[in-house]
Amino acid sequence: QSGIRRLIEFLTAHRLPPELAVRLYRVYGELATDALRDDPYLLTDEYYRADFSQVDAFAIALGVSADDERRVEAGILFELSYNLGAGHTFIPQDKLRTATCALLDLDGEMIDAGMLRLQEQGRMELSQIAGLTACYLPELYEAETYVCRRILSMADGEYPEPGRIDDLVAEIENRQGIDYAPEQRSAIRAAASRQLLIVTGGPGTGKTTV
């Protein structure tokens, strides 16, 4: 208990949330304070979810230089995680560079070097998409490529079109008291003959009825 108390006092003295102490102690035990002094940016890991600006101020107070490789890499990963919170699975490389430059107040060459290191460490993935270089967190790259493979696999096959599709549609119309438009009938026929179909259209165009 005394170890956690000292850790809480250390965190509080540096204006960091004391609730981080339990998770830190769970991982590092009595060596938690030493681990933080060695690499304050470990707090930006998903497990801790510490605020980047607080961690950055903490690191600078401990003597970490503005162009320290750990700071650069943590800033890049923060931007990737931040954009995930906004619903983006990747960021174009030029946008990631610009955002990280602004976050850390560093030039683009340092950010480029940091991105290269993260790639080599397997902590960031790059992919060419529609003429741009997309930057991913590794787990999101794996998830997105898996979804792509599944969609391609589903789209490759075709179900045989039921011979009575028009008769079945007529039965449904009579039973439910609806009258499908020609476009809706076409969508139903397409759905009956494919493993995968995407139905698009604005509000009130009949997607739900199909």
Kindly give the residue locations of the regions a language model identified.
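Conserved ATP-binding/catalytic motifs of P-loop helicase motor domains
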Residues: 1-210
